[in-house]
Regions:
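C-terminal ends and interior cores of transmembrane alpha-helices
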Residues: 88-111, 305-322
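Intracellular juxtamembrane helix-capping segments at the cytosolic ends
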Residues: 129-143, 340-354, 360, 366
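Symmetry-related core transmembrane helices of the 12-TM Major Facilitator Superfamily/SLC fold
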Residues: 90-96, 181-199
């Protein structure tokens, strides 16, 4: 095989992996929007009391607690099509069934109907959170180091596309054809990802398969400490905990800050709800593209600096003003830098995982990161 043929084969392999990762991002983002925005809109339109709608976040607890059953995916892999895609396929089929079943329910003040909706939302969250574990593990095991930045960008693009499709598109369908059509379209979107899961690149067999639940539960932490060393373990955990901490603080205070600057709800909604999403996607693509050239260490430093610059754009907005144009500039800079930081952060988490324990280790590292987002 000549050099050009080898390069072409490598490019095709890269493209195939990125398409697979992006498709799994779609499959991951769609159920989350169904269980939050779509469900809230449906219950509100059906006249369900706000006090009951406020309980929806309780059904989303599986997303927070998923690290407790992540070891099960490492211990008992489903061998077909491979150890990660087996779980992906199972969860996607279950998600299609649950979302489609929700379209048949009629939420009202009837306790039996509300109970059915609540149980469906809980099952949806459990299946979706389990799929997220498998998606993270598959992406981690599949992508070589040089492609992890681009893979993070591809996953984010798929995820955002699903959120827009189910969030905005679902409400448009509900307005025109009714809420069952919105849920059925979301189920169809997840179902459309099943062929991508079946045709995605197959993972290489892992050496030294896990043979006990004890090993699946205790092994990930032991292996991580052994591989990194005690001192470096704490350094890495602090990096995971603090690297995106400024983003979390800014996100929590952005809306109150902009209100204090005198911007209207319409201005904030238009810029934060629309423009910011596009800027984040652009930043993720830029970050993923630069990662392959810069590598992990330089990307971590340079993207962190870009994050500081992005955050300072809000200081400049408060100091110098600028009206709506200044708002758009500040939000654009902050979200572009946030997208870049997010791309390298996902690549960092993937690089810290061992393929034997990637489901559990990624879930644990994500849990450490989640602590920085807690109030």
């Amino acid at each position: 095989m000549g050099a050009s043929d080898s390069t072409l084969a490598h490019s095709r392999g890269t493209l195939r992996r990125l398409i697979a990762v992006s498709a799994e991002g779609v499959a991951s983002g769609a159920p989350l929007m169904v269980g939050s925005r779509l469900l809230q809109g449906w219950l509100t339109a059906s006249g369900v009391p706000l006090a009951l709608i406020g309980l929806i976040p309780l059904a989303e607890l599986p997303y927070t607690l998923k690290l407790f059953w992540a070891p099960l995916l490492d211990r008992w892999p489903i061998p077909w099509p491979d150890r990660r895609r087996g779980w992906l396929l199972l969860m996607q089929l279950l998600l299609v069934a649950v979302i489609a079943a929700m379209a048949l329910l009629r939420p009202s003040s009837d306790p039996s109907q509300l109970t059915a909706v609540g149980l469906a939302a809980l099952v949806l969250a459990i299946c979706s959170a389990t799929q997220d574990i498998a998606v993270d593990a598959y992406r981690t095991d599949l992508l070589p180091e040089a492609e992890r930045g681009a893979g993070a960008a591809a996953a984010a693009l798929g995820y955002r596309a699903a959120m827009l499709s189910v969030g905005a598109g679902g409400f448009l369908l509900a307005d025109r054809f009714g809420w069952p059509a919105a849920f059925l379209s979301a189920a169809a979107l997840v179902a459309a990802m099943v062929p991508f899961t079946l045709s995605a690149p197959k993972l290489a067999p892992v050496e030294h398969a896990i043979t006990s639940l004890r090993q699946a539960v205790l092994g990930p932490a032991r292996e991580f400490v052994h591989r990194a060393g005690p001192n470096r373990t704490w350094q890495l955990l602090l990096l995971v905990l603090l690297y995106r901490w400024p983003d979390g603080l800014l996100n929590a205070m952005a809306i109150p800050f902009l209100k204090l600057q005198g911007f209207s709800e319409a201005d904030i909604g238009l810029v934060q709800g629309g423009w910011a999403i596009g800027a984040t996607i652009l930043g993720t693509v830029i970050g993923g593209s630069l990662f392959a050239w810069l590598g992990m260490n330089r990307s971590l430093w340079l993207f962190a600096i870009s994050g500081v610059i992005g955050n300072l754009s809000y200081w400049a907005l408060a100091r110098f003003g600028g009206g709506v144009a200044g708002l758009i500039t500040a939000v654009s800079l902050e979200n572009i830098s946030s997208g870049m930081v997010g791309a390298v952060f996902v690549a960092l988490l993937m690089s810290l995982c061992n393929p034997r324990f990637s489901a559990t280790q990624y879930a644990l590292l994500s849990g450490v990161y989640a602590l920085s987002r807690s109030p």
